Structures are given as C-alpha cells and as structure tokens.
Amino acid sequence: MSWNYIDTASQVWTHDAASSNSLQIDNATEMWNFFRARGYSEQATAAIMGNAQQESALNPAQWQYGSYVGNRNLGYGLWQWDPAERYWDLYCGTYGYDRTDGYYQCLWVDTQTIGGLEGNQWIGVVAPTSWEAFKVSENSAGDLAYAFCRNWERGNWSEVRRNNATYWYNYFHGIPPTPTMDGNTLVTLYISAKKRKGNFIFEERWYK
C-alpha cells in the first residue's frame, strides 16, 4: 500500500479521525504500521497520529491552509513543518526523498527527532521528558498526544488532538504491524545506501 496525497493548500479532508474517509484510513494504517514496526507503543503511535490528523488531516502533501502550493515560507506536510523549506530543502534535498511520500515524513520523525539535521526536536517541557521514554510509554494515547504537541509540535493544544489519538488507538488496538517482525512472517530487509555529501544514509523498508 502506498500513501495517498493531494497537493493542495485547501482543506480537502477532515480533521476529525472518526469521520475519516477511506484514503485517510489507508494513510493511518501506513502510519500505524510504520511506528509500531519500529517499537513504538500503541499509545505513542496513536498520539503521533492524532496530532498529524489535526495538523494536516493525514495528507502528506498538505500546504498550510490559506497559503498556496509551493509556498516554502509556511507549513507543509503531515506535521506542518514551518517553514516548509525545513522539510523540503533541508531533509528531502539532503537525502533525495520525495516530499509527497508520507513514509519519508514518518522517517523524519523517527530518525531526526534526536540528533538530526536540526539537532533535537523534542524539548521535554512535559512528561515524558525524553523522546525514548515517549516512544515506549503506555500512558493513555490522549495524554501522550498532549506530550507530543507540547514537546515536539510546540503548537497550540486542542482537545481534538486528544480525541483523534484516542480514536486511532481504539481503532488499531491489538492489530500488529504489517508486515510483522516477530519471525513468523518472512520478510526481506531492503536497504539502499545513498551517498549524500560524503555520508552514507541508509533507508530501511520491510516487505513480505
């Protein structure tokens, strides 16, 4: 399954997780599989998803509402990197990634939050104060959505974020990531090395 996207600065999808359309549910499934396969708890994964729903309605090519497509001075993407050039130029430009692919945006969260291209994104003003503790926390999805908003997004808090996180937690609870990494499913780890500015960057994808 690949990510769905609409390259737009208009609101075309809903911010209410419970009212998500099939394209959004597909993207939510991709996000759930991505973070769960990397060891994030169900609650932390849902918290990240709840914030993304509020920021972009789970559209990886969402430009900031009221802006225009291509405006790199305002927000862009699943978590509305602001300005957009932070994601587009610094990250995609460095590694040669497709800006519309939600996979690489999730990869940014997973690999760039601590010690990434911009240093540390997680500021730890509320518990869990460390990124590693957040990733495995089994606090409620709603409480972790608040922690992600304050420590990572650093944006305005809305109970919509909590409600979305709780919804996605209940929706996916107990469903293992696909493909699984428990040894029962045969998987092949595909690794591509990309040489950028003298460094090798390893990109991991799992396939059945």
Segments the model singles out, each with a brief description of its role:
Residues 1-49, 68, 155-208:
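Extracellular cell-wall/glycan-interacting regions and their flexible linkers
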Residues 3-30, 37, 56-140:
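Peptidoglycan-targeting cell-wall enzymes and recognition modules
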Residues 42-59, 109, 149:
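Short, functionally critical alpha-helical segments immediately adjacent to catalytic or ligand/cofactor-binding
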Residues 51, 80, 84-92, 145, ...:
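Charged, low-complexity, helix-prone segments enriched in Lys/Glu/Asp/Gln
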Residues 112-116, 151-155, 171:
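Mid-sequence acidic-hydrophobic segments that form the walls
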Residues 131-133, 145, 149:
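C-terminal binding/interaction regions
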Residues 140-147, 154:
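A charged, solvent-exposed segment within the mature domains of Sec-exported extracytoplasmic proteins
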